[in-house]
Every structure is written in C-alpha cells, then in structure tokens.
A protein has these predicted regions:
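Hydrophobic face of amphipathic alpha-helices that form TPR/SEL1-like repeat modules
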Residues: 1-29
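Rossmann-like NAD(P) dinucleotide-binding subdomain of oxidoreductase/dehydrogenase enzymes
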Residues: 123-266, 318, 394
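Short, well-ordered beta-strand elements within core beta-sheets of diverse protein domains
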Residues: 34-40, 55-61, 146, 256-259, ...
Length: 481
C-alpha cells in the first residue's frame, strides 16, 4: 500500500479519535489487512462541524478567482498522483487498476468543471417598477455534510466535494468504513494544495453515530448522500427537525432494453462493459435485460460468448473483473440465483463463487448469465449489485416499457434501437432520471446525474449539480433621494 494517512482530519490537523480505536481495512482480493483507520464518534464529529462552521465566512468571501485557482491545483495534483491514487483504490476496493485510474482522472475533471462553472453561477435582475431593482443572488449554503459509498471511493467524494467547495461551502465528509483510504488520499492533496484549515474535514467511524450527529446539527445546512434507499430514508427522516437542504442518490435497478432493430454487436458490447464494470457494484448497472423475442436467440448466443471471455482476478493484475467488496455480497447473489432457478430460470454461464488457487482468498464470483427470468423471481425487483445478467423476453414495445417501469427505483435506464420515432417515445416513457439511448455513458461532469421515485432526488454534476449547493436570495432595492 502506498503511504497514506489513516487519521481523522479536523480543522487542518491529522488526529486520532478520542478513544484511540481503529478499524481494519481489508483487501477484498485476498483478505489481507492493509490499514488501520482512526475512528470518530459524536464528539469528534461535532468538532469537525464546528471547524467547518468557523471556516465558512472566510472561505465564502474568498475572491472567486483565488478559489478557482486552488481547485485547479487540486485537480493538477490528482492527475500528477493518479497512479498512486489508483493503486490505493484498487487495494481497498478491488476494482481493476485501469478502472481506478479512470475514476481518479474523472475526479480531477470534476474539480476542473466545478471550478470553471463557479464563474457562471449567474444571479438575475428581474424587471421592476420605476426606482426599484429586483436582484437575485446565489450564495453558498454553509456547512455541507457528505456521506459517500464504497463502490466509488474516490469518484463519489469528488462529485460531491468539488461543487460544494467551488460554490463557497465548507465540508464534513464521512466516507464508507470499508474504503476510506481514497478519501484520505484526496484530503492529503487538499492539504498540499493549501486548502485553508477547517474548510474540509473528514471523520470515519460508526455510520449511525456520525450520521445522527450530522443530521441533528443545526449548523449543518446541507446533506448529500449516496447509498442505499433504506439508509437514505433514515437520513431524510433524521434531517426533518433541522430542515436541511438534501440530495439523495439511492438505489437503482436499471432496465436495458434491446429492440428487434438494434445494432446487436453494440448492444452486447455495451451491456457487458456496463454490467461488469466494478463487478456490477454500480447503482446505474444494467440489472434487468429485456430482449425482443425475434432476436433473443442470436443476442443470447453472442452475449454468453462475450461474457465467457472475461478474466476475473486481483485488480492489480491484467483482469476485466475484480472481487466483490464483502462476503455478504456473495451470499446475496447466491440467494437470488437459487430463488430464480427454483422458479424456472436457467443459468447459461457462471452461477457461483470462483474457487481454487488465489480465488479462495478473496470474494470472487463467476460472471453469470441467467435466462428465462420472470416477475415471480426476486431478481426482477431486487437490485443485485453483482456480476449477474438476467434475461427477460418481451414481444411488444409497450410490454417492454411497462416491465421496465415496474420497479420502485428510477435512476438509470438504457435501450437500443435504430428507430428515431421509438427513441422519442421510449425515452419519454421510461420513468427514470437518466436514459441511455444506444449509449451507456450517462455520467459526465457536464450532465445531470440523479433519479426519481425511490432512487432519490437532487442532481449531481453539471450546472444542476452546482445549484444543489447554493441558496437563492432576493433583494428588493428602492432608490431614494
């Protein structure tokens, strides 16, 4: 493991928790403990909130050009240290090194985009009566609490912190307890770049204790969370008393529809790329694959052949797919597959844990294709978060849309067709915050990312993401003698 901090960072200082407790960070590829991380409780979290609150006035009024310059310096350092940051990420999370490096570089781009977009947070002057000016200003909110997940331990940190900092807010970050090292490495870069003390603080520890301390605090004016719908609902309820501004990016169960006129090669290649990125541990991963009856056999044959070419192993090696994050992830997939096969589904390839040699040391699972999936099976409605492609046959366009929308979630969706009229109809009909039409790249620094229904609300990325971290103030000015 490259050298990286393992302590809390509060008010510009690296510090142990009050109780001196630590938590082991385990490499999911081999079960080895790679670091021991300091743990915080309510007291340390309150100190971090206090530091952020005290740092806010000076940070908010810093000359915009200076703040922009500082954020570009952070991006420069992330790019300069990309290989080291990528190795840290792969060791703690498991994903292949090339995916980790891509995540780091996207993180740097998040800072660049947010820095430049901060120059374009335009206010407004509204036509007013004579001798008046109706002025609308956009101002930072204050202290932002950010809680990030383990599946993108660097990307989710930069996606939240870049716009929050760019718009003049201060931060208390609580990263995932499974993968805090990437966040800590980013905070080392903050320190090296010269971010003023107290502007960004990081605490690791009990999700329940830290979460409750953040939501209970009136000094925290904004909460941003990426994670499960269940936890998001809890945080939403806990934040009600203090009336925080909130954005939640929660569960997803993305449909992927292949119509009979689709470019099959593109659909197969994109499906495999999207499904097995990060071993399927992605909120926008295709989870229900709807294939037109007319092309089902041809599509399935090409898909299985492609999946069987995937190489699974330690992310530091030349592989396509790494390990799952924890043992319980394997248990969940096994349970879903048993439920499905008991009810008539058929495993075409894969379908179990990878064993033997180095596989026995880690949380490895065979890339799996499951056919004959129906609504009677748990996998139709439950997010898998693993390397399983469930195939579902449809006969009509309306049937495909209806089945795709038959979910409590509404984050990402995908469909493949050459028919422009169908693109318009299906794109409008899908009840999802994001739609990929003949494309899987739905997350970009410039474009809004977020969902509807039980996938949460609020947007990240693009100018919509910047707006999540500002508040609007109206000034009615009357000119008097």
């Amino acid at each position: 493991l490259p050298k990286v901090q393992t302590k809390l960072f509060i008010n510009g200082k690296w510090t142990d928790g009050d109780n001196k407790e630590t938590k082991d960070i385990v490499n999911p590829a081999n079960g080895e403990v790679i670091a021991k991380i300091a743990q915080a409780g309510p007291n340390e979290t309150k100190k971090a909130i206090k530091a952020a609150k005290e740092a806010f006035p000076d940070w908010a009024k810093m000359e915009l050009a200076d703040r922009v310059k500082l954020l570009h310096k952070i991006a420069d350092l992330m790019e300069e240290k990309a290989d080291t940051l990528a190795k840290i990420m792969t060791l703690e999370q498991g994903k292949p090194l090339k995916e980790s490096k891509g995540e780091v570089l996207t993180g740097a781009e998040n800072f660049r985009f947010a820095a430049e977009e901060a120059r374009r947070l335009y206010g407004e002057t509204i036509p007013a009566p004579n001798n008046h000016a109706f002025i609308v200003k956009k101002q930072p909110i204050g202290v932002v609490a950010a809680i990030t997940p383990w599946n993108f331990p660097g990307g989710m940190v930069t996606r939240k912190l870049a716009p929050a900092l760019a718009t003049g807010n201060t931060i208390v970050l609580k990263p995932s307890g499974d993968t805090p090292l990437s966040a800590l490495a980013i905070f080392e870069i903050f320190e090296e770049a010269g971010l003023p003390k107290g502007v960004a603080n990081i605490v690791m520890g009990s999700s329940k204790e830290i979460g409750e301390t953040l939501t209970d605090s009136d000094d925290v004016r904004k909460l941003t969370f990426t994670g499960s719908t269940k936890v998001g609902q809890t945080l939403f309820k806990q934040s009600a008393e203090t009336l925080k501004k909130i954005s939640l990016e929660l569960g997803g169960h993305a449909p992927f529809i292949v119509f009979d006129d689709a470019n099959l090669d593109a659909a197969v290649n994109d499906l495999v790329a999207a499904k097995f990125r990060n071993n399927g541990q992605v909120c926008v991963s295709p989870n229900r694959i709807f294939v037109a009856k007319e092309i089902k056999e041809k599509f399935t044959k090409a898909l299985v052949a492609k999946v069987e070419q995937l190489k699974v192993g330690n992310g530091l090696d030349d592989v396509n797919v790494g390990p799952l994050i924890r043992e319980d992830a394997i248990d969940k997939i096994d349970k879903q597959l048993k439920n499905a096969t008991d009810k008539g589904a058929k495993v075409l390839t894969g379908g179990g844990r990878l064993t033997g040699s180095d596989y026995d040391k880690g949380n490895f699972y065979k890339p799996t294709v499951l056919d004959n999936v129906t609504r009677e099976m748990d996998i139709f409605y439950e997010e898998t978060f693993g390397p399983v492609i469930p195939l579902i046959t449809f006969e009509t366009e309306d049937e495909a849309i209806e089945m795709a929308n038959d979910s409590e979630f509404g984050l990402a969706s995908y469909f493949y067709t050459k028919d422009l009229a169908r693109v318009e109809k299906v794109g409008a009909a899908l009840e999802y915050g994001m739609v990929g039409a003949n494309e899987i790249a739905i997350s970009n620094p410039e474009t809004p990312f977020g969902g509807v229904k039980h996938s949460g609300f609020g947007r990240e990325n693009g100018h919509y993401g910047m707006e999540e971290y500002i508040q609007v103030k109206f000034i009615n000015l009357k000119y008097r003698d």
